[in-house]
């Protein structure tokens, strides 16, 4: 991702983003396309204290650390052996769960400053036939630094090994609840969960429209041209996304997450409410009242990240990236040693409650 800026191209892009953030996707002529509007009136099923206690008891930061985070903390720039290893790890972890994830590997080639490179996004979907999907997304690639660091390896702990591990831990911890998605029920909307792990978020040399966001640009374009539900002539996979939740730069102590987009404010406020509820129940670690993660401030700067290709196509976005960025951003100090386990554990709990509430489980 690139830091916020307001000049030149960035300002023009920000205007386009703001316009896209305020407009729903265009509907087709088919009256059946009205289902694409259901996301705007969707209501969560608020969890009570007993259900929240159950979520907290199911998640395990130590298990996540050993089984998901550490295997990802390797050099994994696009096309590297580490990239292949991490991709296989992600697929294996989802395939071992009972919920029944369907795994797609979206592989393609793009020209980069180092010639043509192969990229592979990993998409895990529960019930692809469901009309609507809540999407959680992150990028699994690490930034390519070449030889400039005298043999040292950049592992991108916050950027974005931790978000990847958090998403895998969510799938594991909520495995029993997520199995209910396949059970037909008149009390639940036709709604499911999709996890997207992007390749090629980072620039190889210098951030530009042609050297960044390789995976998300490709997948957004592909989804926009893929009919959904299958056989539809009026709606596509992008219109099937209820909410696109992007996690990035997570893992440092005391992060501050502002609200980036007014059209998803109510979902940001759910995160605030969940954080406050867990705090009041004494379920968050090292979380004094003044250390609130989710702040009501509307962030008016620009952060270019994997959400941009989706936002520009009208997809509602909830961007979970702290501002300011962690001090270790794009340095060799972005390592396991500089992560804060309590913060990550707290955010796991908040995100897992949010997902269950959104899915009405």
Model region roles, listed by residue range:
Residues 2-361:
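Secretory-pathway/membrane protein signature
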């Amino acid at each position: 991702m690139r830091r916020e800026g307001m000049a030149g191209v960035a300002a023009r892009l920000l205007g386009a983003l703001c316009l896209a953030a305020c407009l729903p996707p265009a509907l087709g002529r088919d009256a059946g396309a009205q289902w694409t509007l259901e996301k705007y009136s969707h209501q969560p099923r608020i969890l009570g204290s007993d259900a929240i206690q159950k979520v907290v008891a199911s998640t395990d930061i130590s298990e996540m650390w050993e089984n998901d985070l550490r295997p990802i903390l390797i050099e994994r720039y696009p096309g590297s052996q580490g990239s292949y290893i991490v991709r296989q790890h992600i697929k294996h972890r989802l395939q071992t769960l009972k919920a029944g994830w369907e795994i797609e590997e979206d592989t393609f080639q793009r020209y980069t400053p180092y010639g043509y490179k192969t990229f592979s996004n990993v998409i895990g979907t529960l019930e692809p036939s469901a009309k609507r999907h809540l999407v959680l997304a992150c990028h699994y690639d690490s930034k390519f630094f070449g030889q400039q660091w005298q043999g040292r390896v950049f592992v991108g702990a916050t950027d974005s090994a931790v978000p990847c591990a958090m998403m895998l831990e969510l799938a594991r911890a909520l495995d029993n609840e997520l199995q209910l998605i396949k059970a037909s029920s008149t009390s639940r909307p036709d709604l499911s969960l999709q996890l997207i792990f992007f390749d090629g978020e980072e620039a190889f040399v210098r951030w530009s429209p042609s050297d960044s966001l390789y995976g998300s640009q490709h997948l957004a374009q592909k989804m926009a041209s893929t009919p959904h539900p299958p056989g539809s002539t009026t709606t596509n996979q992008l219109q099937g996304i209820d909410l696109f939740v992007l996690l990035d730069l997570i893992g440092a102590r005391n992060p501050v997450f502002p609200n980036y987009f007014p059209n998803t404010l109510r979902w940001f406020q759910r995160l605030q409410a969940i954080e406050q509820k867990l705090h009041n129940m004494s379920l968050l670690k090292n979380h004094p009242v003044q250390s609130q993660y989710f702040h009501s401030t509307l962030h008016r700067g620009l952060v270019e990240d994997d959400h941009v290709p989706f936002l520009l196509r009208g997809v509602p976005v909830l961007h979970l990236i702290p501002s300011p960025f962690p001090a270790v951003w794009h340095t060799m100090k972005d390592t396991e040693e500089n992560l804060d386990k309590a913060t990550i554990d707290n955010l796991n709990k908040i995100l897992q409650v949010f997902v269950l509430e959104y899915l009405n489980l």
